[in-house]
């Protein structure tokens, strides 16, 4: 008779959990197994739950480790234990799905047994799905940008946040960038939080125009991109303590601001983080004690709009938003071959141009943007 697949029984948070294929290698370069992943999340559960607990989580599964195919799973498996909590989440498409809401170390271990290497929580609590309690500042470097520049932009973010009454909590992304989280009072909608994130991105760009950018289109970016769209509904970001699918099994590490200058993303792995956690505890332990108001950033956004800076492009799978600019990258936009203004109904060209000058006097703001090619004097219409 064929032998049964290998498994191991763990007791986590008072619950019995069967880990299937515990010796399966998930990180070939380091030899880390599924059991190593499960034990990592149990070791840092207090911090990981502060980051991802009580929130709907999208499952990101790597059944054959980081070198195999992975997939995103929004719906919680039907075969889940009865003690796994779920909440029904509605997406921008109008569809709904029951997503997993981890509440204890056992739930994290159960997710890890599904080969969920990463924790991808939504920025809302299961008790209030319409009002995010997290502003996520994603510092995403363009190719070729070094770690020192990323840290410099993080320091600018650190200096900017207090000007708007905000407290920031930095962490490594676990990849190339840094994240800064801000806990929010639960009173703003997703569009408002995204609008605030866009205003912050533009303010950081204004303060450091050679280092940072808020431009959505990759061809327009330079330096470090502040990805404001990570705050749109249905977007998730790898949480603090989340493992990342890198050969060295690094993790997203919560930091104190005093650690930014000397830290390196490679310092934090599933091997080193439990030791750090046991020694220092959670560097974000007080994050929930500092919920902040978005009023300052929303005032800045309103000022931007008065100055002509409206909305910026949304991700491609979102419906076209009111006030959103063209969702076409600049190099593919077709230049109009037609003039913006045609001047007619005058038999003499000088009379037509005089009428045009009167129009410019009445509309000085629009006139300031006109180029010579934008104006056509149509003598035929004046006859």
Where are these regions (language model features)?
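Short structural boundary motif marking the start of a folded domain
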Residues: 335-341
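Short beta-strand
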Residues: 59-62, 168-174, 214-218, 376
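C-terminal accessory nucleic-acid interaction domains of nucleic acid-metabolism proteins
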Residues: 1-31, 38, 49, 53-54, ...
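Short, charge-patterned binding micro-sites
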Residues: 56-72, 172-185
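Extracytoplasmic
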Residues: 334-335, 348-383
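Basic, low-complexity intrinsically disordered segments
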Residues: 58, 63-135, 141, 203
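Short, surface-exposed ligand-recognition loops at beta-strand->loop->(often short) alpha-helix junctions
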Residues: 144-146, 343-351
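Signature for HUH/AEP ssDNA processing cores
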Residues: 100-173, 184-192, 331
């Amino acid at each position: 008779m064929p032998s049964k697949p290998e498994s191991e029984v763990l007791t986590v948070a008072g619950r019995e959990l069967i880990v299937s294929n515990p010796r399966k290698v998930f990180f070939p370069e380091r030899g880390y197994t599924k059991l190593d992943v499960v034990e990592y999340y149990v070791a840092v559960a207090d911090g990981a739950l502060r980051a991802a607990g009580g929130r709907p989580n999208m499952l990101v599964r790597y059944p054959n480790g980081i070198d195999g195919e992975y997939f995103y799973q929004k719906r919680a498996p039907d075969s889940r234990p009865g003690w796994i909590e779920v909440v029904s989440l509605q997406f921008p498409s109008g569809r709904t799905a029951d997503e997993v809401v981890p509440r204890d170390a056992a739930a994290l271990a159960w997710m890890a047994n599904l080969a969920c290497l990463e924790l991808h929580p939504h920025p809302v609590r299961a008790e209030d799905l319409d009002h995010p309690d997290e502003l996520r500042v994603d510092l995403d470097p363009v190719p070729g940008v070094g770690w020192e520049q990323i840290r410099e932009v993080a320091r600018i973010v650190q200096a900017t946040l207090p000007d708007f009454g905000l407290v920031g909590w930095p962490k490594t992304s676990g990849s190339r960038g840094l994240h800064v989280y801000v806990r929010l009072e639960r009173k703003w909608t997703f569009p408002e939080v995204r609008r605030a994130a866009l205003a912050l991105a533009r303010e950081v760009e204004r303060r450091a125009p050679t280092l940072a950018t808020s431009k959505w289109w990759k061809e327009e970016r330079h330096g470090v991109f502040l990805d404001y769209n990570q705050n749109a509904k249905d977007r998730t970001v790898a949480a603090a303590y989340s493992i990342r699918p890198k050969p060295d099994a690094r993790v997203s590490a919560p930091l104190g601001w005093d650690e930014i200058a000397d830290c390196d993303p490679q310092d934090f792995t599933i091997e080193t983080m439990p030791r750090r956690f046991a020694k220092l505890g959670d560097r974000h332990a007080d994050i929930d004690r500092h919920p902040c108001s978005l009023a300052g950033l929303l005032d800045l956004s309103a000022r931007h709009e008065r100055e002509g800076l409206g909305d910026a492009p949304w991700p491609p799978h979102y419906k076209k938003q009111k006030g959103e600019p063209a969702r076409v990258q600049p190099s593919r936009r077709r230049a109009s071959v037609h003039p913006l203004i045609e001047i007619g109904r005058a038999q003499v060209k000088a009379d037509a141009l005089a009428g045009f000058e009167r129009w410019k006097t009445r509309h000085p703001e629009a006139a300031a943007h006109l180029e010579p090619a934008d104006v056509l004097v149509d003598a035929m219409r004046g006859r």
